[in-house]
């Protein structure tokens, strides 16, 4: 994870949880990908294969994963991807805000990948820190090249996109908006927003003359009022003299 993504990670509140909603297992994966020793933090705050396994358990239900992560350890990302990819459950990945770096690899495990409004996906080459002599650095370069090739295979397997195009995306650290991710084929759909409730104004037309005529007819029938003798009629109602 590069410095830019580390800064993003500090702004993403960790939340790793599961719940059953409408007979579907909904798993929230919000936080960095890896093990706590990478970041000196709590184990329950990190996305990794073992954590995801514990959340899925022996469930046979369809799974919805709400993913928000700046990435982290590429090997944990690949391990988590492979675990989810091998499940018999139907898995939907919803990118709620960000799926970057190793998290974008996890996203590829979805039978369906859905981008929420305003969300983004980012893919890039693997990175690491190395030290030693030139032979050590060459070994690290070779390792990074093989990791990148493996990453390309994951994206190509899921999307069917040409490997050369994906390699170009990785080398350029490419960011995709939700719409671009769907357009380029690395996601299946945009999440539909609930339709706003339509305000319907009921117009009531009142026929004032008809109401007045009914009132007059009522008093005429009950009190013997004649419209031509209003004073006499009112006297009957209120007990006045005729």
Predicted regions mapped to residue ranges:
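N-terminal organellar transit peptides
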Residues: 1-94, 98-102, 110-242
